[in-house]
């Protein structure tokens, strides 16, 4: 994983962490789009690692991956709490469904990133 890939992933999560999670449909669609982008990136990252075949060389090329991974988990946890809060405060059924889907996607991405990180250890 080169530094551009790590930077792109970090940028996506950083933008997600700064999003204003308002109640308009545009804001909700933007949030889901960001989550879907994160999921697609996670999928492509996993495929790239499996193609490389040598996970130790991946670790050597990116010695800071553990710190960055920890930061990403913190950002995901913050997003989970933010989405949970929004889910509790909204009464609009469309928003509730959207936030529930976003929450489910965040849990899935967190679990798969965790699984991926264990493969790298």
Curated annotation (Swiss-Prot):
UniProt keyword terms in alphabetical order: Host nucleus, Host-virus interaction, Transport, Virion
InterPro entries from the UniProt entry: Flu_NS2
Motif (Nuclear export signal): 12-21, 85-94
SUPFAM superfamilies (UniProt xref): Nonstructural protein ns2, Nep, M1-binding domain
Subunit description: Interacts with protein M1. May interact with host nucleoporin RAB/HRB and exportin XPO1/CRM1.
Miscellaneous notes: Average number present in a viral particle is estimated to be 130-200 molecules.
Identification of the protein by name: Nuclear export protein
Species of provenance: Influenza A virus (strain A/Aichi/2/1968 H3N2)
Gene name of the record: NS
